[in-house]
């Protein structure tokens, strides 16, 4: 059984999520201890528990310690349940997108349909529009197709969002994402839920004002939804290059003007573009698992503490040679033995 110190590196939920993903894919059981030991509220929190339960559902896993506050977890996966329909209700505004990140690598070619309820646009996790505009499109570039339907949006603290994931298929091998290539255009989605529509327009206009200096076509659509359970707003942007995609997002919050939300996302996007990387700082972390599973290389915007943590967990589960160089940007290469 693989032993993992949960206080290693950044010591957060990323260690657990990466371990769950790779455990289900490889069939290797693990025990993680000192879970979130260095955090103000140590142990498993509700959002982490749902990642455990989601992966338990798809792999018929045996678990010990899967309860709120637990500082130790044993996870023993069995065969993945293909050709199945799974419903996951995180409750309130637990992050749907973090659950998606954990599950998607494990359900490739498994003919599964997964419905997740919770928070689609919440702090400290990618927004659902970033997932749709950037994450899924990068996966498509490396050879993984999928269908993701956003049924309802969910914001903090009420949640109420709903997403359906299905038809995750592909057979990527030894891919290469080393540059963005010529910048073609900027795409985006500016949204509001149960708030005035002008907020979405102001977010969009603010972002466009900053991005106009890039000299390319800008297409930011607005998504206005009234009658949702939770109130909120946000914007996600994607810089479409000839060879890759760079993304950024920002969420509204009480007291934060719509113009600031749009400006924040636009400046994040430009900051990532200035690194001359092929993928942005968030995708740099998320692409590491796929590269290690299928072989390949990419240039990411910045080597974060999450990335270091991911690398160490990957080495515990996979027989793979990892080469890494640089910091901002950095190059990650994985060769499968």
From Swiss-Prot:
Q: What general EC class does the enzyme of this chain belong to?
A: ligase
The record's Gene Ontology cellular component field reads: cytoplasm
Top-level division of the source organism's lineage? Archaea
The active site annotation covers 306 (tele-amp-histidine intermediate)
**Where along the chain is ATP bound?**
101, 282-285
User: According to its UniProt record, which reaction does this protein catalyse?
Assistant: a 3'-end 3'-phospho-ribonucleotide-RNA + ATP = a 3'-end 2',3'-cyclophospho-ribonucleotide-RNA + AMP + diphosphate
An example of a Pfam family matching this protein is: RTC_insert
Question: An example of a Gene Ontology BP annotation on this entry?
Answer: RNA processing
Identify the Gene3D superfamilies for this entry: RNA 3'-terminal phosphate cyclase domain, RNA 3'-terminal phosphate cyclase, insert domain
Q: Which PANTHER family match?
A: RNA 3' TERMINAL PHOSPHATE CYCLASE, RNA 3'-TERMINAL PHOSPHATE CYCLASE
Function statement: Catalyzes the conversion of 3'-phosphate to a 2',3'-cyclic phosphodiester at the end of RNA. The mechanism of action of the enzyme occurs in 3 steps: (A) adenylation of the enzyme by ATP; (B) transfer of adenylate to an RNA-N3'P to produce RNA-N3'PP5'A; (C) and attack of the adjacent 2'-hydroxyl on the 3'-phosphorus in the diester linkage to produce the cyclic end product. The biological role of this enzyme is unknown but it is likely to function in some aspects of cellular RNA processing.
Q: Output this protein's name.
A: RNA 3'-terminal phosphate cyclase
| Provenance organism | Saccharolobus solfataricus (strain ATCC 35092 / DSM 1617 / JCM 11322 / P2) (Sulfolobus solfataricus)
UniProt lineage: Archaea, Thermoproteota, Thermoprotei, Sulfolobales, Sulfolobaceae
